[in-house]
């Protein structure tokens, strides 16, 4: 049984907990502690009720600085300094670092110094971590000695498996990406100050361009794609689910049927449970609470001149990513057991 602590109980932290309790992984992963500066009553309430994912299906209550979920007692901590957390005495195997602000090796080492054996970061990190993993593509890179690992981003997890399939079958020459991402908590409800002038504007009233490092994220997972992709991102007034408009130029000649067939076969084979494929006329809310990293919308596949391919990909940027955190943590422990 993997003993896990969650540091940061926001959108991703809560989704990880809920995803675990809805999955078949509870016999292998146990959340024993959550460190969050918010009050326990607020943590309890936001565990029980969620605007995006609905009510939690299991009874939850507070008891003596613990959150009780069924028969499980999860210790609630409120320590701002990770180095002071009681990870050694709690025998923590992996810390899910989900604050969104700790993203390099030096900062994560505080968890190791506090006694945790490994750290899995829930967002893109600096290049000094041991590995950046997109589950389904490169988890085989994990080694026993790795202590700080990044789970990349929701959009990297969405797009990299698809690029990988296209490249192996048709040789990707170059590509351009537009991420159509739901609003996030770094935006304003009404106009208010922010360092990014576009993010001073009300999130519910505009389509807002934001910076993205998605192209660099692709290069980190697929190094041979260096300088082959560019990406832009816009935030839209929805609370969950992201669409990605992917255009790629392929060296090999293709048609719509061939592209869709190859992608569909991948979802039934090596990427089963990670990438999906649909030919149904669906919209973004239909992918809410979908545990997969990416769903290819076959109805939107287009091919121009036999080499330029446009795809539409969907993902639940919270739920799919939370499920990959669980998957990657299991792979980290598996790699560690190979010593």
Curated annotation (Swiss-Prot):
The keyword Ribonucleoprotein does not apply. CDD domains: GAPDH_C_E4PDH (cd23937), GAPDH_N_E4PDH (cd17892). GO terms for molecular function: erythrose-4-phosphate dehydrogenase activity; NAD binding; NADP binding. One of its GO terms (biological process) is pyridoxal phosphate biosynthetic process. It is an enzyme of class 1 (oxidoreductase). Belongs to the glyceraldehyde-3-phosphate dehydrogenase family. Epd subfamily. Its main location: cytoplasm. Its EC number is 1.2.1.72. Keywords: Cytoplasm, NAD, Oxidoreductase, Pyridoxine biosynthesis. NAD(+) binds at residues 11-12, 317. NCBIfam families: E4PD_g-proteo (TIGR01532), GAPDH-I (TIGR01534), PRK13535.1 (NF010058). Pathway: Cofactor biosynthesis; pyridoxine 5'-phosphate biosynthesis; pyridoxine 5'-phosphate from D-erythrose 4-phosphate: step 1/5. The record marks 181 as: Activates thiol group during catalysis. HAMAP family: E4P_dehydrog (MF_01640). It catalyses: D-erythrose 4-phosphate + NAD(+) + H2O = 4-phospho-D-erythronate + NADH + 2 H(+). InterPro entries: E4P_DH_bac, GlycerAld/Erythrose_P_DH, GlycerAld_3-P_DH_AS, GlycerAld_3-P_DH_cat, GlycerAld_3-P_DH_NAD(P)-bd, Glyceraldehyde-3-P_DH_1, NAD(P)-bd_dom_sf. This is D-erythrose-4-phosphate dehydrogenase. PANTHER family: GLYCERALDEHYDE-3-PHOSPHATE DEHYDROGENASE 2 (PTHR43148). Catalyzes the NAD-dependent conversion of D-erythrose 4-phosphate to 4-phosphoerythronate. It comes from Shewanella pealeana (strain ATCC 700345 / ANG-SQ1). Substrate binds at residues 153-155, 199, 212-213, 235. The keyword Transmembrane does not apply. Transmembrane segments: none annotated. Homotetramer. The active site is at 154 (nucleophile). GO terms for cellular component: cytoplasm. It comes from the Bacteria.
